[in-house]
Amino acid sequence: LKEEIIATSASGLAWTIVYIALIYRGLKDKSYGMPLVPLALNFAWELVFSIIYPPSTTGIAGTIINGIWMLCDIGILYTYFRYSYNYFYNRYKITKLTWIGLSIFAFIVSFEIMFIGGPFFGQFKYYFNGDIFQGAIFIAYIQNLIISVCFILMIWERRDSKGQSLTIGVFKCIGTGLTVGIYYLFWQHHGKAALMNIIVGVTFLLDLLYILTIYRQLITDGFNPWKRL
């Protein structure tokens, strides 16, 4: 339990830095840094698993961290709804009403996934010990894999660094694979969680690729990667 609280707290701090950096860069660049799908999944996860199904093993510490993340997500939501429509219009030529409808639909579906998914995975006692929040952790790692893919695709599609920074990439990597990822695989499951080994391992490699990609893009855009928050 002590190791879990340490890993969760370290991950919570790292991801809070990621969220603050996303908000800061979004406002500074008048852009948005988290694509719609991972943003909707993230917000729904933190809403459901801090209020409806709060963590049982990490207690109040886990609930507070999830609550802080949910509040940070509101800031990221602002940058998305404030600045993303132009990107959608330029790329897909959709109307603002269509964009709003698709965005709302993404958030509704994400909420349903989290609300139903936690209990669904939690029912498998052999792997998740009948604990809904253990199911939530599994969902979170799949979600993190999606985030990593979307971050890379966003840079490749935009061909600029707006809304992004090396800070986001480095602390995402720390907050996922190098903290709770290590705990989950080697302390809790002793390296025997084959599927999670693949998910966490691939996510870690994609995070390294994202760090390299944003570093090169910042150089191309004329920024010092180490001085851009």
Question: PLM features: what roles do these ranges have?
Answer:
Residues L27-L39, S161-I168:
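Membrane-interfacial loop-to-transmembrane alpha-helix junctions, especially the N-terminal start
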Residues R82-R158:
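Membrane-proximal helix-loop-helix units in multi-pass membrane proteins
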